[in-house]
Amino acid sequence: MDTVRKTRETAFDELCIKTQGFLDQMMSLGVTSCEAKSGYGLDLETELKMLRVIRRMNDEHPMDICATFMPAHAVEEKWKGREDEYIRLCCEEMMPQVRRQGLADYVDIFTEDSVFNADQSRTYLEKARELGFKLRIHADEIEAIGGSVLAGQMKAVSAEHLIKIDEAGLGSLSEGGVTAMCLPATSFYLGADFAPVRRMIDEFQIPVATATDFNPGSCPSLNLQFVMN
């Protein structure tokens, strides 16, 4: 939660300067398009601030940036044991404001045993779809608790991580036409397993993409060339 605290404390203009530096580094490595997620605010004010930074950068920087709203990235201490209430807050207060202001095209959620369960994720994603957002989901990074199955059922654009995906999840992604967004640099830095990409392609004909997952907690690299290797 240290990053959440620092993001809340940092002024909009300073966040823009930091973000511009990251984008410049990415462009120097040949990247011309990227996705940027919120998720280090966990409250409406800071989530909106992050999305406005993304919009400013998309307007002013040569990088083509796709914005994803992800308030359901973690569970703050005050919401532990009250995750249903937090999901309701996301659905009833946060998402409608983001949609009205046109700050994001996508919504994402971290479906994991220690974060949000599959039922909570379904409620969240159904509301996002109702409001016109396209769907993404962080699934099966630590345990397979139904996130990838849900991604297929909801026909999400992508499901991220998928390190622990099971047979049911593989089948659901394939049937739902979901892109498996595999993040090998995160596995590298955490010393974790890699997603079963070969099975995804050969046995289930799942479209596979890769990305850096550049973030302060689990992947300090924004080098897509490193990821591809």
Question: In which residue ranges do the predicted regions lie?
Answer:
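Alpha-helix C-cap/termination motif
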Residues: 29, 60, 100-101, 154, ...
